[in-house]
Amino acid sequence: MAQKLEAKGGEMGDVWDDGVYENVRKVYVGQAQYGIAFVKFEYVNGSQVVVGDEHGKKTELGVEEFEIDADDYIVYVEGYREKVNDMTSEMITFLSIKTFKGKTSHPIEKRPGVKFVLHGGKIVGFHGRSTDVLHSLGAYVSLSSTIKLLGKWIKVEQKGEGPGLRCSHGIAQVGNKIYSFGGEFTPNQPIDKHLYVFDLETRTWSISPATGDVPHLSCLGVRMVSVGSTLYVFGGRDASRQYNGFYSFDTTTNEWKLLTPVEEGPTPRSFHSMAADEENVYVFGGVSATARLNTLDSYNIVDKKWFHCSTPGDSLTARGGAGLEVVQGKVWVVYGFNGCEVDDVHYYDPVQDKWTQVETFGVRPSERSVFASAAIGKHIVIFGGEIAMDPLAHVGPGQLTDGTFALDTETLQWERLDKFGGEEETPSSRGWTASTTATIDGKKGLVMHGGKAPTNDRFDDLFFYGIDSA
């Protein structure tokens, strides 16, 4: 099933329509003196290649070819349209085509005329109008047949001596236990350096015994992930902006180890993002003593070495409070704060050591940072966050929001998951929460603890968005 996107441009010329196919394999664009003279597309249906008609007229200025790899597809077309010379109707003056994997036919740049875009999923056909030039262009977009994620929020009962009211901390799951470390109650004042452990069977918090290289700083803006039975903790700062190094905690022996002193590892920071796969721990962005960062570093737990990943392009600005998740071998950076809230999405391919920015669509969440996030199958699920900075910066609450959204990393489509006030246990607006991917009572989902309230108070609740189908 495909949706027909309206053709953008002028009304002059004959209408043409290539129809719908499985994929687009090649695009031919002919140049005219003032814009696009003609286009032609090659499509794929199964093993058959279908060569479309020429729309417009070739000139002596040549033809450019753009080939799409067999395992890739077009997700975004950007163009400009304008009335040229004495034309009574607009023509297309510029086209740039971008694929899911980030391949582009031309650098996307501002041009004279009116900008238009065609996107919304996998593009599987084109239509438009033409005379001796291309006057308009539209597209067909394949609609995903993926079933919407079905789930609901529950408030998890808590007993025992837990983290209590706090924000800016980190949590991670190992087996049937959730661990919490760091955080603040009063702005910029870390609370303690206990490692709290929540038993999912008894719903009871306790303070974990600790031996070895116990972190010497109580810290806020810290992040923590788990790989197997080991927790990894990086960064965070105290009230005087002294920073923590990189630690591991073996949950089977309750032993801390200082893996990398603060002066030997990646740039010390707070309010960064962390994620992990089976062999690597990733650290992205955050705020150092002097600036925000946009670097990605990975630590291989087998080799016990840091690797500084390739530098992203200018479009991935330095930021804190971003979502960072590993999905199907790619490391995804979602939104964040670079002086203002942003809504761009990028992924890093560790095999190619390459960054790609993607264009998302659907029911997109507004710009935000310091939200809860989790990776569930091919989806990234987020909740809440800050949508506008407070005039007092971190001392104030900022403008905080709610809402549960999921990004399908294959189709690049966002959807809203929760109901609008329809569930009693839906969390209230908040940011600066601690969150992780978790499995509770056999369901995988997003678990989050605490956070900052719109009143600038702190939460101490524990919520879980469990997925029934994915």
From Swiss-Prot:
Its EC number is 4.8.1.5. The active site is at residues 237, 292. Induction: By herbivory. Kelch repeats lie at residues 177-225, 230-276, 280-329, 331-375, 379-434. Expressed in seedlings, leaves and roots. Observed in seeds. The keyword Metal-binding does not apply. Coiled coil: none annotated. It catalyses: a (Z)-N-(sulfonatooxy)alkanimidothioate = a nitrile + sulfur + sulfate; (Z)-phenyl-N-(sulfonatooxy)methanimidothioate = phenylacetonitrile + sulfur + sulfate; (Z)-N-(sulfonatooxy)prop-2-enimidothioate = but-3-enenitrile + sulfur + sulfate; (Z)-4-methylsulfanylbutyl-N-(sulfonatooxy)methanimidothioate = 5-(methylsulfanyl)pentanenitrile + sulfur + sulfate + H(+). Disruption phenotype: Reduced simple nitrile levels in favor of isothiocyanates in tissues corresponding to its main basal expression. Abnormal accumulation of glucosinolate in seeds, during stratification and germination. The keyword Lyase applies. InterPro entries: Jacalin-like_lectin_dom, Jacalin-like_lectin_dom_plant, Jacalin-like_lectin_dom_sf, Kelch-typ_b-propeller, Kelch_1, NSP1/2/3. CDD domains: Jacalin. A (Z)-N-(sulfonatooxy)alkanimidothioate binds at residues 237, 270, 292, 321, 370, 432. It holds the Pfam family Jacalin. One of its GO terms (molecular function) is lyase activity. If the presence of Fe(2+) is not required for the production of nitriles with benzylglucosinolate as substrate, Fe(2+) is mandatory with 2-propenylglucosinolate and enhances the global lyase activity in a dose-dependent manner. More active at pH 7.4 than at pH 6. Specifier protein responsible for constitutive and herbivore-induced simple nitrile formation, especially in seedlings and roots. Promotes simple nitriles, but not epithionitrile or thiocyanate formation. Converts allylglucosinolate (allyl-GSL), 4-methylsulfinylbutylglucosinolate, 4-methylthiobutylglucosinolate, 2-propenylglucosinolate (sinigrin), indol-3-ylmethylglucosinolate (glucobrassicin), benzylisothiocyanate and benzylglucosinolate (glucotropaeolin) to their corresponding simple nitriles in the presence of myrosinase. Belongs to the jacalin lectin family. This is Thiohydroximate-O-sulfate sulfur/sulfate-lyase (nitrile-forming) NSP1. The lineage of its organism: Eukaryota, Viridiplantae, Streptophyta, Embryophyta, Tracheophyta.
